[in-house]
């Protein structure tokens, strides 16, 4: 009697391939498009309320524009104080100015100023800085002597504006000493003049001879 083998159990992969997929649900119904002529509605299908206290919403928009325009450069949103909107958030802060002017009396003289400058009195009329006037002569120094050499005393000379009296204070200059070589110098100059005269006469004769030869050549026919 032959042995009958039992059939193998069904494979799970074969069962999944043989199964049919479940049917898909039907698509949802399409909602109709809202009418554009009706009132404006938001996402919750509620009418958009108008601004309170306005009939058509224009005054409220103007108030918003005014509130936006009131914001200055330093109060603009997204900017830190001290930063300008044109430079962006990463721009460095502006360089601080020199600050208020300091009074030299309060803080003393600066490093470049002489401490004695603050003790000098103000300059009078006709005075120049560094040159005191007639009444402000430094102590311990005599007054400067005038250039005429008479200690400030001007005499009445013969000419207008002359200084120093009649002009007899200064002796006349002494005469020059006699030249011992005057005779030899005159003799040398005389010999040179004679030599130049002879050379000049010789040059004139040469020119006259050349001119005569030239005229004779022109007069003879060729």
UniProtKB/Swiss-Prot annotation:
Transmembrane region(s): none
Signal peptide: none
PTM comment text: Phosphorylated by host ERK. The phosphorylation triggers a structural change that enhances keratin binding and protein stability.
Keywords, comma-separated and alphabetical: Early protein, Host cytoplasm, Host G2/M cell cycle arrest by virus, Host nucleus, Host-virus interaction, Modulation of host cell cycle by virus, Phosphoprotein
Region (Disordered): 1-184
Feature: compositional bias, Low complexity: 76-89
Positions with biased composition (Pro residues): 20-32, 90-101, 170-179
Keyword Lipoprotein set for record: no
Chain intervals with Basic and acidic residues compositional bias: 1-16, 48-73
Gene Ontology terms: cellular component: host cell cytoplasm; host cell nucleus
Key word Phosphoprotein present: yes
Subcellular location: Host cytoplasm; Host nucleus
One GO process term, biological-process aspect: symbiont-mediated arrest of host cell cycle during G2/M transition
Assembly behavior: Assembles into oligomeric complexes. Interacts with host CDK1. Interacts with host SRPK1; this interaction may favor expression of late viral transcripts. Interacts with host cytokeratin components KRT8 and KRT18.
Family: Belongs to the papillomaviridae E4 protein family.
Note in the entry: The major E4 form is first synthesized as an E1^E4 fusion protein from spliced E1^E4 transcripts, such that the first few amino acids of the E4 protein are derived from the N terminus of E1.
Job description of the protein: Contributes to multiple aspects of the viral life cycle including viral genome amplification, suppression of suprabasal cell differentiation and egress of newly formed virions. Induces host cell cycle arrest at the G2 phase by associating with and preventing the nuclear entry of host CDK1/cyclin B1 complexes. Inhibits cellular DNA replication by preventing loading of host replication licensing proteins MCM2 and MCM7 onto chromatin. Within the cytoplasm, associates with host kinase SRPK1, a splicing factor regulator, and inhibits its activity.
The protein's name in its UniProt record: Protein E4
UniProt lineage: Viruses, Monodnaviria, Shotokuvirae, Cossaviricota, Papovaviricetes
Encoding gene per record: E4
């Amino acid at each position: 009697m032959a042995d009958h083998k039992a059939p193998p159990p069904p494979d799970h992969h074969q069962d999944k391939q043989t199964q049919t997929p479940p049917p898909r649900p039907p698509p949802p119904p399409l909602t109709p498009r809202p009418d554009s002529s009706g009132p404006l509605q938001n996402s919750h299908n509620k009418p958009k309320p108008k601004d309170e206290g306005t009939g058509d919403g224009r005054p409220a928009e103007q108030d918003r524009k005014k509130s936006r325009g009131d914001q200055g450069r330093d109060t603009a949103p997204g900017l830190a104080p001290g930063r300008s909107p044109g430079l962006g958030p990463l721009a460095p802060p502006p360089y601080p100015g020199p600050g208020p002017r300091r009074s030299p009396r309060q803080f003393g003289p600066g490093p470049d100023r002489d401490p004695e400058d603050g003790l000098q009195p103000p300059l009078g009329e006709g005075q120049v800085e560094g040159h005191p006037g007639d009444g402000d002569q430094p102590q311990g120094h005599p007054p400067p002597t005038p250039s005429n050499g008479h200690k400030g005393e001007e005499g009445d000379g013969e000419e207008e504006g002359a200084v120093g009296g009649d002009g007899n204070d200064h002796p006349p200059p002494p005469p020059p000493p006699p030249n011992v070589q005057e005779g030899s110098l005159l003799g040398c100059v005389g010999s040179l003049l004679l030599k130049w005269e002879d050379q000049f006469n010789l040059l004139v004769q040469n020119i006259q001879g050349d001119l005569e030869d030239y005229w004779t050549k022109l007069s003879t026919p060729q």
